[in-house]
Each structure stands twice: as C-alpha cells, then as structure tokens.
C-alpha cells in the first residue's frame, strides 16, 4: 500500500479539526523513507494555543494509527506528524486571517503599490478591510478590497502601537470610514 495522499489525509483530518472549531488550512507531505513528515496546518478565528494544538495533534495521530491498524493507511517505516498554525510569514489569503490579525501592521501590495498599514475591521460581507496609515502626524483611513490582486503579509512589530492607530482599528468598518472622511 502506498503512502496516503493529501486528499485521503484531508478526508480523515477535516472532521477532527472541525470538532475543535478550527479549519484545515492544508496538509504537506514530505516522503523521505524513515523520516517522512506529515505537516497539518490549522487555523480559526481565535488563536489556538499550544494545548489546543496538542489535543488536535493527538486526535489526528489516533485516527492515523487506527487507519494503519485497520490496513486502510500505510505510512511505511514511520513518519513525524506536525500540527501547527500558518506562520506570520504566510500571506493573508482569507478573510479569517485578516480578522485574526486585526490591529497588526501589514505589508500590503495593491495593484503594484506597496505600503505598510495597520489592519482594521472587515466589512459585513468580508470583501473589504479598513487599513490605517500614519502620514506625518495625520492618520489616513481607507478601505482595501480583498481581491486576488491584493497581497498582504503581517509585519513583525517590536514597538507598542500608537494608541490613536489602535483606536481607529478598533472601530467598526463604517465608523472607521466615517472617521477617515472627517480627517481629510
């Protein structure tokens, strides 16, 4: 029996992840004889902590072990199971990831124009997000469409964010747009 495919593992892992109100972001397989790796990436609207990831990892391991014992799966000589969340260096590819990173700085590229701005609220249908940028002493608030031509990666920030920036990113979408119009 061959090493299980990503599709087969996805069918087995998705229900386990869903029990914990998480979403399966992806599965990566690196086959390397005795050192094969199955890396499972999960995410949710809340930030899963290490205890939650350990619980999910243990349950996925139990499902894989049961599949091997029943002869339905074969991981060969052995494998390492790794369960984690997408790293900060991963692009913000879903509305959930934008929502989860609210108040953080983001390196943003929209239609070829690059900038660093702070993430605010999403609109109701999750097709646009508020971003805030400081220009001198002034804060500029704008809406950015979450489209395929929008590239964004969270920036690591060592300094404490300015209170006025956080106040704007804490506002609801329409409130932030109104505040942006007032500041023009």
UniProtKB/Swiss-Prot annotation:
Keyword field: Cytoplasm, Ribosome biogenesis
One Gene Ontology CC term in the entry: cytosol
One GO process term, biological-process aspect: ribosomal small subunit assembly
Location within or outside the cell: Cytoplasm
InterPro entries in UniProt: Ribosome_maturation_RimP (IPR003728), RimP_N (IPR028989), RimP_N_sf (IPR035956)
Primary location group: cytoplasm
A Pfam cross-reference name: RimP_N
UniProt superkingdom: Bacteria
Recorded family membership: Belongs to the RimP family.
Function description: Required for maturation of 30S ribosomal subunits.
Protein name: Ribosome maturation factor RimP
Source species: Corynebacterium diphtheriae (strain ATCC 700971 / NCTC 13129 / Biotype gravis)
